[in-house]
């Protein structure tokens, strides 16, 4: 676009130009596998990365490119890569940075699927992880080793909604010449611009707020373009010639978007966790109303939090905007627009009581997703974080009497009444 625009304008227009053939205002779904070369020279140039363009939809596609450009614009990054799922985006990010013999530092209060990837799956390939209290900077510092290649956090933790001190953490991590990675799924780029607080790479499960309607699985990696891979000295894979692509050097030949380009031309090319054009189209539809939806999500959530915090059957509500939350000051600093609509609360009692409340709800759907237009509920200890040991659950702040809510776009009075009736069953 020719000049700088605000978020609400970018979410509707960034990454899209009018289709030159049909003049369609809506973005077409380019449901194709491959693309015709003008001549043999163009084919050679495209494969050698000497010319931008489309070769095969596993690597690039016009519908996906529009989605990637739009989310990059909303995050303030230099480039993005769409993937088949949020876990694919996270896995690609880690595998691009860390190889066999390398090490990761990660927040202990992260999504159960991410925890399992780091603790159980990646060690089989020689990548180990130390889980830390991300709020304890001394503990983070002590965990970083010579072979540590990244520090991984969540902008809003899942499911505790804990908030890292981004600025302080980024300063510490960058002193060790490694990047700070943040899963920005729960926050969205509308509630926080993580790149302005020192994060180098953001990942999303586009399945959540970006799509917004629980219809599509997808993920996306966004590159800030700010990390200096050459000066770091720890990432030769982005600096040295790549023999699989005619000895291209990503830092020399691509520049600021070196990281995200390398992920596309190596990991996506070779392992193929590509987003479908149809899903990209649905995610673009979701982005058009992202700010409006998130505002309503937040408004509903804050009213429900207020109700639950005053209920006699509720032991605790974990929501950073509450005055007594340990994250209240960080919420005020980093999240002036709100801290989203996903949070947990603990009922008085144990697992039996938590299950009874969940099973008594009528509007809330009991399922393992969040950030849908519809309100959702789940019991983290037995579902999303059920693969974790009791000790690991405790370290992540998960207890048997805890319930996670994802507040949707329904009338908030109806949602409060649904919760009131369910809590009366205790």
Give, region by region, the residue ranges found by the protein language model.
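Conserved PLP-enzyme active-site core in the AAT-like
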Residues: 2, 11-13, 17-20, 80-309
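N-terminal "arm"/small-domain region of PLP-dependent enzymes with the aminotransferase-like
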Residues: 2-61, 69-70, 403
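Conserved N-terminal alpha-helix of the aminotransferase class I/II PLP-enzyme fold
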Residues: 39-88, 113-121
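PLP-dependent enzyme catalytic core of the Aspartate aminotransferase-like
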Residues: 119, 128, 146, 293, ...
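Active-site beta-loop-alpha junctions enriched in small/polar residues
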Residues: 156, 185-187, 322, 348, ...
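Short hydrophobic/aromatic beta-strand micro-patches
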Residues: 222, 344-346, 406-408
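Conserved small-domain helix->loop->beta segment predominantly found in fold-type I
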Residues: 271-274, 278-280, 285, 289, ...
């Amino acid at each position: 676009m020719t000049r700088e625009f605000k978020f609400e304008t970018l979410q509707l227009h960034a990454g899209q130009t009018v289709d030159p053939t049909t003049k369609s205002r809506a973005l077409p779904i380019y449901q194709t596998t491959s693309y015709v070369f003008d001549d043999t020279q163009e084919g050679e140039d495209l494969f050698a990365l000497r010319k931008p363009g489309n070769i095969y939809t596993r690597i690039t596609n016009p519908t996906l490119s529009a989605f990637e450009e739009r989310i990059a614009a909303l995050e303030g990054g230099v480039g993005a890569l769409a993937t088949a799922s949020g876990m694919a985006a996270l896995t690609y990010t880690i595998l691009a940075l860390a190889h066999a013999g390398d090490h990761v530092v990660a927040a202990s209060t992260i999504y159960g699927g991410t925890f399992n990837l780091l603790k159980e799956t990646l060690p089989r390939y020689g990548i180990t992880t130390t889980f830390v209290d991300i709020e304890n900077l001394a503990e983070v510092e002590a965990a970083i080793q010579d072979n540590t290649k990244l520090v991984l956090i969540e902008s809003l933790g899942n499911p505790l909604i804990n908030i890292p001190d981004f600025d302080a953490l980024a300063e510490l991590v960058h002193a060790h010449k490694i990047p700070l990675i943040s899963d920005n799924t729960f926050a969205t780029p509308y509630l926080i611009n993580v790149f302005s607080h020192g994060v180098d790479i953001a990942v999303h499960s586009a399945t959540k707020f970006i799509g917004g309607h629980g219809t599509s699985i997808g993920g996306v990696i966004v590159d800030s373009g700010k990390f200096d891979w050459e000066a770091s000295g720890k990432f030769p894979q982005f600096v040295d010639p790549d023999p699989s692509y005619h000895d291209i050097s990503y830092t020399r030949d691509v520049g600021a978007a070196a990281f995200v380009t390398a992920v596309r031309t190596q990991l996506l090319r070779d392992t193929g966790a590509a987003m479908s054009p149809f899903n990209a189209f649905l995610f673009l539809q979701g982005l058009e109303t992202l700010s409006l939806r998130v505002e309503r999500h937040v408004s509903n959530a804050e009213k429900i939090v207020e109700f639950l915090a005053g209920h006699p059957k509720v032991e605790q509500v974990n929501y950073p905007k509450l005055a007594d939350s340990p994250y209240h000051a960080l919420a005020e600093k980093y999240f002036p627009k709100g801290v989203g609509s996903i949070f947990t609360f603990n009922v008085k009692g144990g697992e039996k009581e938590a299950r009874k409340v969940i099973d008594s709800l009528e509007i809330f759907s009991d399922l393992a997703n969040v950030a849908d237009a519809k309100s959702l509920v789940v019991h983290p200890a037995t579902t999303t974080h059920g693969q974790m040991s009791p000790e690991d659950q405790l370290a992540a702040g998960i207890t048997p009497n805890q319930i996670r809510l994802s507040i949707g776009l329904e009338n908030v009075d109806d949602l409060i009444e649904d919760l009131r009736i369910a809590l009366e069953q205790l």
